[in-house]
């Protein structure tokens, strides 16, 4: 009898300890989640938080399955919101960029030999869910090859919603948690489009998703104003000549998906003859000509890719870059390791191609892209969804001028006029708060803001979750 009481007492104490740490025993509906638990990744330092990764099927008929990686909060995860991070491209991996270069808990060592801690990881104050979408990106796959040549915004949004619904069945402890959707670049489409799918779902569901807000950075927003703002940025930052600038302005119809041959030629001339060998994602950072791990030239198929952003003319090729600036290579080495894939429960179907940071097949066959997402912004603002938009001010791909031109079309009333915000007594950037939307610049940051300015990005994220204006001192 005494032994039985002791066993009961021990069990209750164990549950109490787990609850005090913000964790709950896994049982019932979460048995499936337990199979996704990551015990440890190769070369990983010791951590106190829990990790899960695996696949969620979003379309059984075609066999479309999306890969995710959840890194729970390092302290009291049950009290923290769920933050979904999406990378753009389209066709680029949130595991390669968001998780491994920007906001995740780990960075990849040179040569892909192991991992080290990111001291500005966003999972210190949230539960981070990285999603590789659509199928064909990273470890996500489809059994119907035609999906890779026939995808776009609408299917991506619908599959992402289906993923989230199914994922919450697997992780019921997140069912009523506050949800925030974040991302950058072409995720300027993914994020608001997923938010709209959630809002529509909530109207017809008995179990609505607790979407609280979105935040996007250097985000593709509106074709016309993004393109106009991009060309203006090139000229104002002395990247192109007066002559080329005026020719682009007078020749190109920035609203069109497919530009005239004359306009395409002007874009190509500007980038090939006038830009020079720069990193377009951070015009003041060194380009990745040689990998710093001694791998020699790094312009091949497994290195930086020339990718097209759909808001730009079809012939315009953009480099997807990182900053060391060759970190993309480390990710491709690390995530192609069989021991890493096993630890992540990834590539379980033995996909017949290597894991890559970006899919050129998807990027070049993207056939459905909205010309603007500004109407969705209006819907979110009207629906009380928190909306923050930030911009690294040395990115020339989706530059700050593009974002400002696009947001100006919303004609929002100003609540707090333009002012500098501070990080460690230094100007972190500038911000303006509108009715329903906060706009923030990050000084000296490139396209991947958390990569170039991790401390400032973390402060930005912290205030976003609080729903408070950034500090004036």
Swiss-Prot record:
The glycosylation sites annotated in the UniProt record are: 46, 143, 289, 299, 347, 367
Q: Does the keyword Glycoprotein apply?
A: yes
| Gene Ontology CC | extracellular region
Q: Which InterPro entries does this UniProt record tie to the protein?
A: AB_hydrolase_fold, Peptidase_S10, Ser_caboxypep_his_AS, Ser_caboxypep_ser_AS
Q: Sorted alphabetically, which keywords does the UniProt record give?
A: Carboxypeptidase, Disulfide bond, Glycoprotein, Hydrolase, Protease, Secreted, Signal
EC number per UniProt: 3.4.16.-
- Gene Ontology biological process terms, A to Z: proteolysis
Task: List where in the cell it is found.
Answer: Secreted
- Look at the named UniProt entry and state the broad enzyme category this protein falls under: hydrolase
Keyword check for Transit peptide: no
Q: Which Gene3D superfamilies match?
A: 3.40.50.11320, 6.10.250.940, alpha/beta hydrolase
Which superkingdom does the taxonomy of this entry point to? Eukaryota
Write out the similarity annotation.
Answer: Belongs to the peptidase S10 family.
Concerning PANTHER family, the annotation shows: SERINE CARBOXYPEPTIDASE-LIKE 25, SERINE PROTEASE FAMILY S10 SERINE CARBOXYPEPTIDASE
Its recorded name reads Serine carboxypeptidase-like 25
Which organism does this sequence originate in?
A: Arabidopsis thaliana (Mouse-ear cress)
